[in-house]
A protein has these predicted regions:
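Conserved ABC ATPase "signature" region
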Residues: 116-148, 189, 196-199
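The feature captures the beta-strand-to-loop junction immediately N-terminal to the Walker
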Residues: 38-40
Length: 256
């Protein structure tokens, strides 16, 4: 990690009435870092993501992306810029389109101002489509979906659809991706594929990641640093080894 963090969040607070879901949490993600965010159910992880990505406005605190204060920006505004993207626990794909078409559409949504500017008539439009297809094919290989690239997304497994979603988020060349439980509901073999895809994207493109994940083996495997939340507050922060052997974390999250 060098220079300013790609994401720097300070004193974040979000309350719903008398319930404080996130209480004065500060966190940073370094450039090129894979950082984990864990905690028991109800610890504030998803609310923290929502505040960081503009889905929910925090009551207090600041969010800086690449050194720019984006506190209070809407989810759409942040997404349109393409520098920081997030996944949701519910996977969404274009079921009738094949894998490659899903990625091309995703790339168009971020890269060009209107659908018909990409899929129009003329040499410029053809060049844009060709560039998107080239990028899509590179990412399909990274996601391990090459053999099924021409199959409708709706015919593939839930794990494969998560890989489509992951590859789609890489289309606009983001600097940071926030993943919300990317391993949930997929079989062990595909978990290995998702882990490898995250690693490849990080190594090849320098994408930084902040990952919410309940699979502790995955988090300790791919993350250089882990932040633990409990009851809306930061409980601990450290290397995977430090977190696994932290007694307070074991009591709150790992079952003692």
């Amino acid at each position: 990690m060098t220079g300013l963090p790609i994401l720097e969040i300070s004193g974040l607070r979000k309350a719903y009435g008398a319930v404080c879901a996130v209480d004065n949490v500060s966190l940073h993600v370094g450039r090129g870092e894979i950082c984990g965010l864990i905690g028991p159910n109800g610890s504030g992880k998803s609310t923290f993501f929502d505040c960081a990505t503009g889905l929910t406005r925090p009551n207090a605190g600041t969010v800086k992306l690449d050194g720019q204060d984006i506190t209070g920006w809407s989810l759409n505004r942040i997404a349109r810029e393409g520098r920081m993207l997030r996944s949701f626990q519910k996977t969404v794909v274009f079921s009738a389109l094949d894998v490659e078409e899903n990625l091309v559409i995703a790339g168009q949504m971020f890269t060009f101002p209107g659908l018909w500017s990409t899929f129009g008539i003329g040499a410029a439009a053809r060049d844009r489509v060709a560039a998107l297809k080239e990028r899509a094919r590179e990412l399909i290989k990274i996601a391990g979906l090459w053999e099924v690239r021409h199959q409708p997304a709706g015919k593939l497994s839930g794990g494969q659809q998560k890989l489509i979603q992951f590859a789609s988020m890489l289309m606009p060349e983001p600097k940071l991706i926030l993943l919300d439980e990317p391993m949930a509901g997929i079989n062990p073999k595909l978990i290995e594929r998702v882990v490898e895809s995250i690693r490849l994207a990080n190594e090849k493109f320098g994408v930084s990641f902040l990952v919410i994940e309940h699979n502790i083996d995955v988090v300790t495997d791919i993350c250089a640093r882990i932040v633990v939340l409990d009851q809306g507050r930061k409980l601990a922060e450290g290397t995977p080894d430090e977190i696994v052997h932290n007694q307070a974390v074991r009591e709150a999250y790992l079952g003692g």
